[in-house]
Amino acid sequence: MFPGIPVTTNLPVNVSTGTNAGHLFYVNYTPVNSFAIEYEDSAKFMGPDVKKSPQEFLQKTENLSIPEGPAKIVFEQESTFDGYPAREFEYAVGGKGNYSVRYKMILAGGRFYVLYVIFLTANPHPADRAIFFNSLSLN
């Protein structure tokens, strides 16, 4: 449930990583609030290392998602979503930007979902974020 009509874009196919398809849907609700979901299909998400420890894969992906510099992790949690491994985390960027990003990552077989919301740290709109994150349905 996006707070508006999402823009859709296809991400380029990356042969070197085995990514077959990527899709991004996003809404810039206001100049300082954005909602997005991205997913990729790839055989690498079914690989033995990922299957052996999906939460380790999600933790490594979290580490790669956080920008260097003033970003600070303010929340992180392992979880599941419809029985699939999931992880949620949030980081805040101080300084002039003073924004935060909340992520929810889900590893569902050969598909990797990333939902995220970008917002002003001082104005997080947790109810809107919860509605957006909880509206995802895996069919």
Identify the role of each PLM range.
Residues 45, 73-75, 99, 113-116, ...:
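Generic preference for well-ordered secondary structure
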Residues 13, 20-21, 46-51, 76, ...:
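A short, polar/proline- and glycine-enriched secondary-structure boundary/capping micro-motif
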Residues 41, 93, 118-119:
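Short beta-strand segments enriched in hydrophobic/aromatic residues
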Residues 32-34, 84, 98, 107-115:
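Coil-to-beta-strand transition motifs
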Residues 3-8, 53-69, 110-139:
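Surface-exposed amphipathic alpha-helical segments
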Residues 4-26, 59-106:
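Signature of long, low-cysteine stretches enriched in small and polar/charged residues
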Residues 23-56, 103, 114-115:
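A short acidic-to-branched-hydrophobic micro-motif
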